[in-house]
Amino acid sequence: MALIDSNDFFRPGWWIRSAHLQTVWGRATRPRRLVAYRREVWETPDGDDLVLDWLDSAPGTPIVIALHGLEGSSYSVYIQGLLALTARRGWRGVAINFRSCARDPRRLGQILWNRRPRLYHSGDTADLDFVVRTLAAREPVTPLFAFGASLGGNVLAKWLGENPGQRAVAAAAVVSAPFDLSASARHMEKGLGRFYTESFLGTLRPKALEAAHRFPEAAAKIDLRRTREAKTFWEFDDAANAPLHGFAGADDYYARASSLPFLTAITTPTLCLSATDDPFLPPTCLERARVAASSAIEFVTTARGGHIGFVGGAAPWRVRYWAEERALAYFDLHAPAK
């Protein structure tokens, strides 16, 4: 495993050294529409809709597959920022919207519901696998790269470990991933983590309740009272997310969905970027992931950067997003020579 002291690479802006400012800055200040997508809706093997948002370029150019975080979408600013950089390289980009996360492009606050009685979860790699295999079959000589942030990073890392012999994805980048879901969930019950937790639960609770309203099969699995009253990730996952997706409970879900046990099996060149001040992760989570990482993983930790932050630049009006730039630079290293 290549371990880099990434302080050689990343310096937060002098004006934004706080982990919490790093975490919220992009969402608070970047435009909600950075790119203009072309939308495709694919039918999944289980008979559902999978919404993919594309940035096009010339046929045959490399494709970057992007996976968003918890309660995000293709319109999450870090996904749009990454794909904007992809387009500047003359490459193509495609953002996968996890089930129940796709947005109406005309009204970004409006969720587009799926047909199946389910939502999404941190260990669900089936849709990523479907997209990779479909693209590889359609364009067998086109280089594919994959980027995942937060929950999407956990999904990507788990998929890479589940498929150690895969050759379709040439390289991957994982940013701010909660490799140990149990440790992350417990960490978010403390201090300011409770603020972030309530922010997420503010959309997760009604989404689960709406799924129960729409689908009798979902209502039969979800504990509606406990879902309404959930104040922590563990309580929500145990009442709704885990049983809805076939897990015995939150602990079973965390154990089976965490990417940590899969890191040792990864053979694809993979860049893992994390900050030790990430308010979503305890430091022990990153240390355990670093120890477990295979030799194919370049594990980069920074002292600062928050959660999917890594905001630099000389001033607030001259901002640079280091993780997005670093991920694309890593893909450049593994792209075929022109």
Question: Model-predicted segments: where are they?
Answer:
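Short, surface-exposed "cap/lid" segments of acyl-processing enzymes
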Residues: L55-Q110
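Catalytic histidine neighborhood in serine/cysteine hydrolases
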Residues: A292-G309
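Catalytic active-site module of serine/aspartate enzymes centered on a nucleophile-bearing elbow/loop
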Residues: G305, A314-K338
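Catalytic nucleophile-loop/oxyanion-hole region of alpha/beta-hydrolase
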Residues: R99-F145, R318
